[in-house]
Amino acid sequence: MNPDNYLHLSALLFTIGAAGVLLRRNVIVVFMCVELMLNAANLAFVAFSRMHGQLDGQVVAFFTMVVAACEVVIGLAIIMTIYRARRSASVDDANLLKH
């Protein structure tokens, strides 16, 4: 498959993720859309790496996946804290952390 196709797929996935972040109110769905955007960026890194014949993009994608794994742990802990306090998983309830 042509690397250009991977870049188009990456742009499509990133757009879907960005639309989900902007349009959805459920924290878990927003969180999944952010992860989709990160995976789209990883796909673009790997596609550019393959286009240029170097491993730099693959290394960046690997480290991005490590950071995303840490983000998942922290993000789910925050979501669970909000849900336990408010019994809701809405983005509007995220102001709980201010108090």
Curated annotation (Swiss-Prot):
Its main location: membrane. The chain crosses the membrane at residues 3-23, 28-48, 59-79. GO terms for molecular function: NADH:ubiquinone reductase (non-electrogenic) activity; quinone binding. Keywords: Cell membrane, Membrane, NAD, Quinone, Translocase, Transmembrane, Transmembrane helix, Transport. GO terms for biological process: ATP synthesis coupled electron transport. The keyword Transcription regulation does not apply. It is a multi-pass membrane protein. It holds the Pfam family Oxidored_q2. It is found in: Cell membrane. InterPro entries: NADH_UbQ_OxRdtase_chain4L/K (IPR001133), NUOK/Mnh_C1-like (IPR039428). It is an enzyme of class 7 (translocase). It catalyses: a quinone + NADH + 5 H(+)(in) = a quinol + NAD(+) + 4 H(+)(out). GO terms for cellular component: NADH dehydrogenase complex; plasma membrane. Its EC number is 7.1.1.-. Belongs to the complex I subunit 4L family. NDH-1 is composed of 14 different subunits. Subunits NuoA, H, J, K, L, M, N constitute the membrane sector of the complex. NDH-1 shuttles electrons from NADH, via FMN and iron-sulfur (Fe-S) centers, to quinones in the respiratory chain. The immediate electron acceptor for the enzyme in this species is believed to be a menaquinone. Couples the redox reaction to proton translocation (for every two electrons transferred, four hydrogen ions are translocated across the cytoplasmic membrane), and thus conserves the redox energy in a proton gradient. This is NADH-quinone oxidoreductase subunit K.
